[in-house]
């Protein structure tokens, strides 16, 4: 069985389990399989529903976790989206397929910026802009955002990210301890300016390092 057939079975499994619920997320997963965004030695494991190593001691999230966050985000075509923590570039590619416009993704590790750019180029993704910087501060030049997705765990919700949301926008972020245990929060900025927070349960992410995250 080739890589794509294995990946297709993983997508079908996530759909059966109710993790992938929308056609947009399913189509994005089928368009950009995870094996396109890992090193060659890990490609044959990319269909397994677990995190995988990427350079600089980081990881690419398990498929179910990525799907959960994308479904919570309720992405639609034309939305302005910021991703904090580019990693391999896979999540940014999925986002870009759904919104079909420019996506901004910020990464603090130079090695991963280059890794993600190479992966995105090979995959034919042209609408993702990878920026080297401190993602805990957001990316003010392209704010405000409809959605901000953070792929690393913070000690608390970074204020700059909330400030950079549009009225009606949502921030998806793991918040909790440094050592791989957080709660996945959906922070919604109501049109009135009121902030509502919904807890989607326990998750495990690498730490968000930065001025408004954890210190190195």
From Swiss-Prot:
Lineage: Archaea, Methanobacteriati, Methanobacteriota, Thermococci, Thermococcales
GO biological process: methylation; protein modification process; protein repair
Subcellular location: Cytoplasm
Pfam family, one: PCMT
Naturally occurring in which organism (per UniProt): Pyrococcus abyssi (strain GE5 / Orsay)
Family: Belongs to the methyltransferase superfamily. L-isoaspartyl/D-aspartyl protein methyltransferase family.
Gene Ontology CC, one term: cytoplasm
Name of the protein described by the UniProt record: Protein-L-isoaspartate O-methyltransferase
Protein role: Catalyzes the methyl esterification of L-isoaspartyl residues in peptides and proteins that result from spontaneous decomposition of normal L-aspartyl and L-asparaginyl residues. It plays a role in the repair and/or degradation of damaged proteins.
Keywords: Cytoplasm, Methyltransferase, S-adenosyl-L-methionine, Transferase
Molecular functions (GO terms): protein-L-isoaspartate (D-aspartate) O-methyltransferase activity
PANTHER family membership: PROTEIN-L-ISOASPARTATE O-METHYLTRANSFERASE, PROTEIN-L-ISOASPARTATE(D-ASPARTATE) O-METHYLTRANSFERASE
Gene3D superfamilies: Vaccinia Virus protein VP39 (3.40.50.150)
């Amino acid at each position: 069985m080739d890589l794509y057939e294995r990946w297709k079975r993983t997508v079908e499994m996530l759909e059966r389990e109710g993790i992938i619920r929308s056609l947009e997320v399913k189509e994005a997963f089928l368009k950009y399989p995870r094996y396109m965004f890992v090193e060659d030695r890990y490609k044959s494991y990319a269909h397994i529903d677990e995190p995988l190593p990427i350079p600089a001691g980081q990881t690419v999230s398990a498929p179910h976790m990525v799907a959960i966050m994308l479904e919570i985000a309720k992405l639609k075509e034309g939305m302005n989206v910021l991703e904090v923590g580019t990693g391999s570039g896979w999540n940014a590619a999925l986002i870009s397929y759904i919104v079909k416009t420019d996506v901004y993704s910020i990464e603090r590790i130079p090695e991963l910026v280059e890794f993600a750019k190479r992966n995105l180029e090979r995959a034919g993704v042209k609408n993702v802009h990878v920026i080297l910087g401190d993602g805990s501060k957001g990316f003010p030049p392209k704010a405000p955002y409809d959605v901000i997705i953070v792929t690393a765990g913070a000690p608390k919700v970074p204020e700059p990210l909330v400030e950079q949301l549009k009225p009606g926008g949502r921030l998806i972020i793991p918040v909790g301890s440094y050592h791989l245990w957080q709660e996945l929060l959906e922070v919604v900025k109501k049109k009135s300016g009121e902030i509502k927070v919904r807890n989607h349960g326990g998750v495990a992410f690498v730490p968000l390092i930065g001025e408004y995250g954890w210190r190195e």
